[in-house]
């Protein structure tokens, strides 16, 4: 006999151990002969990471598919692994060194520091895998990969060298997102916009001597200028005055009539003295500010593009750590005549932190009368998500991938339907990103990561090879082949050769996303031709969040299509489907963040409710394209769903339903059993199709309805007289049928609730119900049974009883009161059903007797069931007048509250200023009140008709 209650805390580790000891999730286990493969690669979590709700949703959905396909007999591989997370890991280890008062990264040197990181990884990295196991993730854990593993590193080197030699990787000087704290380039996804209360400084840039223009200062109601003033300066606005030191132009729109006469003229840059041109460009908006925009091509992405078009110089005035550098800066000093009057200002600014320099520059401009005005300005400032400080667009030389060329086959793969996005609307986002793709900056100024396989000769010549030996060989061939001073220099070095004398390796490492882009094939052994690569590539579906479609999904497609070919040489996509799941938000629909204090820890939920309850909640709420609003109360509700199944199993055991030996579904004789077998087959079909179509919420919903409503609430309830009766044949059939259906339920629910179902599968074994495999290896049920007549009959009975119960509840009939039931207009089939199920109707609907009549009795509530009308004469059971009055008062109360909420929601100030969760709560309350009013209105109509 099952324990009275299910203890998830005790069961989950026991089941996890059983799976582990059985090697239950090894690739190919449980596969049928010549089975087709089903492959998923896990989005590799950071080695520094811990499980969050996004991981929980993402991996729950993957696990549902993996367990489903494994039970269907496919050759399944769910490939696990971790990302080395360059910046995050380096920061964690550096912080640990500081906390332990050990030598810093710089003090210990590169080799010792990297060794220290590997030690940290062995001690503390990979915590998230144990957390994923607690969630029930059925990966092939024996195949765990790490992006810095030897094999994966070999793949990274091979790809870099190949792309470089094809001209698809190159060095270039461009603007990058630069983190002055970490002193490295970072990717867009590592940039977090933060709203700050700043200022907009409107600065006056003097026109060169003798140049003036007429600037409008008054306008009529149609916006036409009526007054002008002569100006010898332009007003430009900026939120970053410190960058003005690098200004090399002022842009105005070519159609802006205010400035037509001075395009091509120059302004004199304050503090610097540089003569910079006024250029006409489409970028400035004439309706914003003065319409004149200062151009700092070395410190702003938009200005960089304008500068390229207009031929403006690029002057970098910030060091790697965000300090002003001008006095020994050749780019800054070029073309300046070094007026002594400015040297004092330069001395004050040299070496100052950017924000300190901002204050000094504003002071200097105010002293010179060149600050037109200052206004408060709330705006978004990009910050590095790791360093936590404002990032700087910075002009540096970096390594780039020609993403535009690699993107073309990926775009074609989606357009031609070889890779599909689910939901499909994400394809539009994919195309927008890919068709406007920029060169991909792949170098990072870090130590932890894949060091770029590039070496520099004494003259700066680049040699990109798989290792230093190959690079040295290439360098020698290069220099010896060309007559000149370098040939003699290298020949001299070779006579007394010492490692490192001829070549110097690039110190940068690759962007973490570079190695992640190879994940679908590097984890299978590429560039070696392994059996796993041949069998499991192409993978089937990638499950991901929308935020990394560009950073990861698109890049995997670019790399996969470039490097993976079939036997005919045709490029092969890394996956045929990309399933994009939504965000997990809090119960009020707010994005979870530490600053809001609304982060929900999935491990705490597992501790409290069990992994199965969390998984089922996430699945049933995972509607395509709709964010998950996670309320712990919902998880508690779905824990109750598990309890319902547990109790149903106990009920079955107590009533002898412990074996399905000899049970043949097609031979079932009782209508109730034929009905549940039909509904079971319908559920099998619905669940299977929904999982195949990535409609996880519909699959979970179908299971919930079948298990809770049809099986527990109706089937077991309708069987009670059979279990307690004297018809032994009917009892034996029903006991066997119940055991059979329960086994099928365990199988169907297993992908969603693996721990409880595996426990039930084990605990219900016995003679005639032997378990030859773990449930996770049991065969997925087949939808083969159909008896529409039985289904129609029992569903008719359910509709009738449910209708009577609803009327009783709506009209406030006391639960113990027995009501008469009068049937009007029943045809022969309905009359036969009434006779067959009379005892069930009386017991379940609290009906005293059933009569037939030609007209509905006066004072009765009526329910239409099929062609007949079921009438409940309630005048003798309730005071119809008092009930009518009660309902009218309830409706009036609802109306008052509805009007109050409608008034608040119509108030623009409330909607604009109240906390979003409060506004959302009021909207949800309004929906509840509308539903209440509808129900009360139906009840009032029934009472009025009955009276």
UniProtKB/Swiss-Prot annotation:
GO molecular function terms attached to this record: aminoacyl-tRNA deacylase activity; ATP binding; valine-tRNA ligase activity
Broad class of enzyme this protein falls into: ligase
Annotated ATP binding sites: 594
Subcellular location: Cytoplasm
Motif ('HIGH' region): 45-55
Alphabetical UniProt keywords: Aminoacyl-tRNA synthetase, ATP-binding, Cytoplasm, Ligase, Nucleotide-binding, Protein biosynthesis
Gene3D superfamilies attached to this UniProt entry: HUPs, Isoleucyl-tRNA Synthetase, Domain 1, Valyl-tRNA synthetase, C-terminal domain, Valyl/Leucyl/Isoleucyl-tRNA synthetase, editing domain
Domain of life the protein comes from: Bacteria
Reaction(s) this enzyme catalyzes, per UniProt: tRNA(Val) + L-valine + ATP = L-valyl-tRNA(Val) + AMP + diphosphate
Disulfide linkage: none
Enzyme Commission designation: 6.1.1.9
PROSITE patterns assigned to the protein according to its UniProt record, in alphabetical order: AA_TRNA_LIGASE_I (PS00178)
GO cellular component: cytosol
GO biological process terms, semicolon-separated: valyl-tRNA aminoacylation
The keyword Transport appears for this protein: no
Matching SUPFAM superfamilies: Anticodon-binding domain of a subclass of class I aminoacyl-tRNA synthetases (SSF47323), Nucleotidylyl transferase (SSF52374), tRNA-binding arm (SSF46589), ValRS/IleRS/LeuRS editing domain (SSF50677)
Major location (coarse): cytoplasm
Family according to the record: Belongs to the class-I aminoacyl-tRNA synthetase family. ValS type 1 subfamily.
Free-text comment on this protein's domains from its UniProt entry: ValRS has two distinct active sites: one for aminoacylation and one for editing. The misactivated threonine is translocated from the active site to the editing site.
Physiological role: Catalyzes the attachment of valine to tRNA(Val). As ValRS can inadvertently accommodate and process structurally similar amino acids such as threonine, to avoid such errors, it has a 'posttransfer' editing activity that hydrolyzes mischarged Thr-tRNA(Val) in a tRNA-dependent manner.
Quaternary context: Monomer.
Protein name: Valine--tRNA ligase
Organism from which the protein derives: Rhizobium meliloti (strain 1021)
